[in-house]
Design a protein with these regions (language model features):
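Structural signature of alpha-helical solenoid repeat scaffolds
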Residues: 75, 112, 149-150, 183
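Alpha-helix N-cap/helix-start positions at coil->helix boundaries
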Residues: 35, 64-65, 101-102, 136-139, ...
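N-terminal "cap/leader" segments of large eukaryotic alpha-helical scaffolds
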Residues: 10-57
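Alpha-solenoid HEAT/ARM repeat scaffold
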Residues: 24, 35-39, 53, 68-71, ...
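Eukaryotic acidic, Ser/Thr-rich intrinsically disordered low-complexity regions
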Residues: 14-18, 163-187
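A positional/architectural concept
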Residues: 48-76
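Amphipathic alpha-helical scaffolding segments comprising HEAT/armadillo-like alpha-solenoid repeats
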Residues: 16, 46-58, 82-95, 119-132, ...
């Protein structure tokens, strides 16, 4: 009887050791987001929200390919789950002047997506998009214009107020969304 109990205890201990090793092995195999393609990185962040911080950290990497991958994943995340990036806006804003056009246009695109889907005012997002509208890159300006149009379609009053505030005329492509029309917004 004592031998059977001892053997049984050994078997339980062995099973626990195997489970512990398997768990440690699984933890060690976490693939960094920087090594993933955009769709996989987005799926990972959605299933493990605390990894968003890792994605945001990638924006500050010295390697352009890593920053680009992060920006593309954040733009895709903004399309499907914009609310998940609301708290990350200050971190995203830190990188709006990145050296890479690719990174900048993805971030501007993300600002437009997030701003168009929030229930509060879009004015804070407009200032970010406005930075893109004055960018040296034609592609960034084009993406910023589309993002601003998306915001204008959602909240035309915010657009009018923003351009009054910055004392600039409303661009014609945005004026068509405003209640008083292009002629009333020439400033």
């Amino acid at each position: 009887m004592k031998i059977a109990a001892f053997v049984s205890l050994l078997m339980v201990m062995k099973k626990l050791e195997i489970q512990r090793r398997a768990e440690n092995h699984r933890r060690k195999r976490i693939l960094p987001l920087s090594g993933m393609q955009t769709p996989d990185a987005v799926k990972t962040v959605l299933s493990q929200p605390r990894r968003l911080e890792e994605l945001l950290d990638m924006l500050g990497d010295k390697e352009l390919s890593i920053r680009s991958r992060a920006a593309a994943a954040l733009a895709r995340l903004a399309e499907s789950h914009p609310e998940s990036l609301l708290k990350a806006m200050p971190r995203l804003r830190e990188h709006i002047h990145d050296d890479s056009d690719y990174v900048r246009w993805h971030l501007i695109y993300a600002f437009g997506e997030i701003g168009a889907c929030v229930s509060s005012s879009t004015r804070e997002f407009l200032s970010d998009v406005f930075v893109g509208m004055e960018d040296s890159s034609r592609v960034v300006r084009m993406i910023a214009g589309k993002a601003a149009a998306r915001l204008a379609a959602k909240r035309p009053d915010d657009i009018a107020a923003f351009f009054r505030e910055v004392q600039r005329p409303v661009p014609p492509e945005l004026a068509k969304y405003l209640p008083e029309g292009p002629e009333g917004n020439a400033n």
